Amino acid sequence: MALSKDLMLKCSEDMMSAYKSACEEHPKLKSFDASLQQRTNKMIDSLTVEDKNGSSSPHDAHMELSKHLVEVTQGVADFITEIEDDVWDNQALKYLVLAYFENTKKTLEIFKTIENCVENAEMGQLLIREALAEFEKESAEKDVGGKKKKYEKTLEDLKSFKEMGDPFDGKVLTTQFERIKKQQESLLEEVSETRKKIQDEISNLEKKTLITNVVFGAAFAIVAVASIALIATGVGAAAGFGALAAPLLAAGWAGVYTTLDKKKDALNKQLEGLKKVEEIEESVEKGIKTNEEATETVSILVDGLEDRIKNMLKLVDNAIDHEDNEAATRIVLTQISKKVEKLTKKITEVGESVEDHSKLIAKARLQVLQKINR
């Protein structure tokens, strides 16, 4: 599920450069990024361990990336809930965070669809198991008078399984994955626009801080020049200097300094707040990227399960086609017997993984909404 080339060209260079700089400047973001890299490296290592067939299974890949997505989503939630400044007054930021967790809601919708598919697949498993039980029972039976077809009940159950079809077939999941892709592309564009707004605000504040320093320097210079002028003109000598300089310092230098110092502190506080906004926005951006990876892997996993079930359907076809050939039927049903437990295990694990993942994302989302809406 790759992002469009135009969008990548629009976002990647500036955003990655800004992200790198932000990590170098902000300790918390640097720590967040370091933990993210560590988890990613661990995930890559686990996915590159080859099994005896020379590749990592789609199911294992899903389990690793699903765990990774949960950790990143929780990381984004933790980062946001730790922020205590008034950064949530920034509506652009608030909208961005809400948009991110709206994106995770779309992911939950996909997982719910997969859960429904898993339930249907489990119903199919019951029919397969019943067919296998009948197979064992009918294998021990003697054919009475040549009139009773052996494995008749077995084949009835297999036909029922075939009639159910493939629970992962159709366009439902494909359509939802396309929806999540478009949602993510739209969200990345929003991230890009929000970054620009935040950077403009920071730039303006930095300019204001510079101006206050210039004003302060000019005021100080006026006082200094006035003092020099007093001495140079010899007005009142030291006593006269003191009489004129003291009011100037009190009304000018000290007053300007105090005013500008307060203003500078206020501006710096706002600037730090906006820099924290950038940190949050960067962590949200990372969350989007990882969310995309995880949903892509769910797609791979679904393809894997779909292939397994289609293989089972072919075996069922084989058994039905050879119902008059006892030896061929036995061979096919034996193959089904070997495959059914593996398939059942995979389907169960997928269901449990998706359910756990959904709960964790929903919990993280609730934490964030409570934080920014209080």
Swiss-Prot record:
Organism: Arabidopsis thaliana
Record field: transmembrane: 214-234, 235-255
Protein name: UPF0496 protein At3g28270
Gene3D superfamilies from the UniProt entry: 1.20.1170.10
Disulfide bonds: none
InterPro entries to which the protein is assigned, alphabetical: DUF677
Source taxon at top rank: Eukaryota
One Pfam family matching this protein: DUF677
Membrane listed as a keyword: yes
Keyword terms of this UniProt record: Coiled coil, Membrane, Transmembrane, Transmembrane helix
UniProt feature coiled coil, ranges: 171-210, 256-321
UniProt membrane topology term: Multi-pass membrane protein
GO CC annotation, single: cytosol
